[in-house]
C-alpha cells in the first residue's frame, strides 16, 4: 500500500532542495527522519514535516505497521519564479529571481 504527500510553492530553490531529498530517497522512515533532523539545510525541516504527513496519511489509509514504511519516491519540481527588481546605478535595475519548489513524496511498505 502506498501513501503520498505534496508540498506546493515552497520558497526554496529546487536545486538546493534536491540535495536534501537525495539523502532520504529509498531509506526507511525512521532513518530518513533521523537524517533530516541532523541536517543543517533549511529545507530539511520542511521535508521532515512532509514525511510525517505522509506517515499520517498511511495510518489513515489503514497501514498496519508504520515501521515497515520506506521512501519509495521523492522528487522536487521547480515552481513559479517570483521576479523582483533592485535599483542599480545610473537608473538601471537588476532582476532578482526567487524560485519556488513543489515537493512530492510517496511511501510504501516493505514486503
From Swiss-Prot:
Disulfide bridge map: none
GO molecular function: rRNA binding; structural constituent of ribosome
Gene Ontology CC: cytosolic large ribosomal subunit
Pfam families: Ribosomal_L22 (PF00237)
GO biological process, alphabetically ordered: translation
Superkingdom: Bacteria
InterPro entries noted in UniProt: Ribosomal_uL22, Ribosomal_uL22_bac/chlpt-type, Ribosomal_uL22_bac/org-type, Ribosomal_uL22_CS, Ribosomal_uL22_sf
Keywords (A to Z) from UniProt: Ribonucleoprotein, Ribosomal protein, RNA-binding, rRNA-binding
CDD domains: Ribosomal_L22
Family statement: Belongs to the universal ribosomal protein uL22 family.
Function: This protein binds specifically to 23S rRNA; its binding is stimulated by other ribosomal proteins, e.g. L4, L17, and L20. It is important during the early stages of 50S assembly. It makes multiple contacts with different domains of the 23S rRNA in the assembled 50S subunit and ribosome. The globular domain of the protein is located near the polypeptide exit tunnel on the outside of the subunit, while an extended beta-hairpin is found that lines the wall of the exit tunnel in the center of the 70S ribosome.
HAMAP family assigned: Ribosomal_uL22_B
Assembly description: Part of the 50S ribosomal subunit.
Protein name: Large ribosomal subunit protein uL22
Organism (species): Citrifermentans bemidjiense (strain ATCC BAA-1014 / DSM 16622 / JCM 12645 / Bem) (Geobacter bemidjiensis)
